């Protein structure tokens, strides 16, 4: 019998939205959610300002999709490709990762001073968070209250940045390019929406970005290198280890 663990219906499993079931299903009954077309629609909507953030791991993995040596860092080519696809601004999730580090450090200092809610647990992985919620609900006081870099970026983009460029939050579309499918689930959580407007509107995987680049007829390996946009494209080296 082919079924989830414990023969439970899929909707009743303690799913952490990692996406591995798609790869492991022996009969090919599952498929990932494809978010390329919502991105294309946003890019072709003249009423929307569309910005994109890319996770650190994407700049390495994207090169392999186009035949570059494994481990090749393709940051500049990736930024160029994203601009050619039509994104108004290309930003780096590392900017928000630096903020996450500062927020978590501040929170740890306060907890140590008050000697409460220790130890502090931290992870930007939504699968890990969901696993904790499923398996260890009695420990939910331990994780840091800081958002993941993806969600912190979205919150900043829909507030500070939207105000800075004079665009209403509902007309600013934030797209994330992430190495993990669970980031799609994270962006959909209720606590990351305000007045019906999501902090991060659409999440695509590295492979989906590669598909979009091919669909646009872009020769990735031949691209010149460009830099991220300012101010949300600036970061320190410490942020890169978030992945």
What are these regions (language model features)?
Residues 2-9, 138-144:
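Short helix/strand-bridging catalytic loops that position acidic/His residues to coordinate divalent metals
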Residues 5-16, 167-177:
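Immediate flanking context of iron-sulfur cluster ligation sites
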Residues 32-243:
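Iron-sulfur-associated redox domains of electron-transfer enzymes in respiratory
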Residues 1, 14-38:
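Iron-sulfur cluster-binding cysteine motifs and their immediate structural context
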């Amino acid at each position: 019998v082919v079924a989830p663990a414990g023969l439970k219906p899929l909707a009743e499993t303690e799913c952490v939205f990692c996406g591995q079931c798609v790869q492991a299903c022996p009969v090919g009954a599952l498929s990932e959610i494809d978010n390329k077309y919502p991105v294309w629609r946003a890019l072709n909507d003249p009423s929307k300002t569309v910005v994109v953030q890319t996770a650190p791991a994407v700049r390495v993995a994207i090169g392999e999709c186009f035949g570059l040596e494994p481990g090749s860092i393709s940051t500049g080519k990736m930024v160029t490709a994203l601009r050619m696809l039509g994104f108004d601004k290309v930003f780096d999730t590392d900017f928000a990762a630096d903020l996450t580090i500062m927020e978590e450090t501040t929170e740890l200092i306060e907890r140590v001073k008050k000697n409460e809610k220790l130890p502090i647990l931290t992870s930007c992985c939504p699968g890990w968070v969901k696993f904790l919620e499923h398996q260890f609900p009695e420990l939910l006081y331990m994780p840091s209250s800081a958002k993941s870099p993806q969600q912190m970026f979205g919150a900043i983009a829909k507030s500070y940045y939207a105000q800075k460029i004079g665009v209403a939050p509902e007309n600013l579309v934030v797209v994330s390019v992430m190495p993990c499918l669970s980031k799609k689930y994270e962006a959909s959580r209720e606590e990351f929406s305000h007045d019906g407007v999501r902090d991060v509107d659409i999440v695509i995987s590295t492979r989906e970005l590669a598909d979009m680049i091919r669909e646009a007829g872009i020769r990735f390996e031949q691209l010149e290198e460009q830099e991220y946009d300012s101010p949300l494209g600036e970061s320190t080296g410490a942020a890169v280890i978030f992945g």
